[in-house]
Amino acid sequence: MKEGIHPDYREVLFIDVSNDFKFVTRSTIQTRETAEFEGKTYPLAKIEVSSESHPFYTGQQKIMDTAGRVEKFRNKFGSRATGKVAAK
């Protein structure tokens, strides 16, 4: 393998922002932030969904609205978004 052409493969702290679940794994992701976890400082990567919050793994259906998308949709379309097909 050539020297200097491969990304740095290192331990990275991932934080699921929907439920504050943290885990460390190895990755080549480039981050600017760092965080301390279990007494050690790691590069920090924030993620919206992990195995701790995804409905497939948790067995629970829940709305994960991190950016106000549901409210924005309801404000834009209101009662028109009832799912009923309009008669022609």
Curated annotation (Swiss-Prot):
Family note: Belongs to the bacterial ribosomal protein bL31 family. Type B subfamily.
Pfam family, one: Ribosomal_L31
Any one Gene Ontology cellular component term annotated for this protein: ribonucleoprotein complex
Statement: the UniProt record of this protein carries the keyword Membrane: no
InterPro entries according to UniProt: Ribosomal_bL28/bL31-like_sf (IPR034704), Ribosomal_bL31 (IPR002150), Ribosomal_bL31_B (IPR027493), Ribosomal_bL31_sf (IPR042105)
HAMAP family: Ribosomal_bL31_2
Organism: Paraburkholderia xenovorans (strain LB400)
Subunit organization: Part of the 50S ribosomal subunit.
Superkingdom of this protein's organism: Bacteria
GO biological process: translation
Name of the protein this chain belongs to: Large ribosomal subunit protein bL31B
Molecular function in Gene Ontology: structural constituent of ribosome
Keywords: Ribonucleoprotein, Ribosomal protein
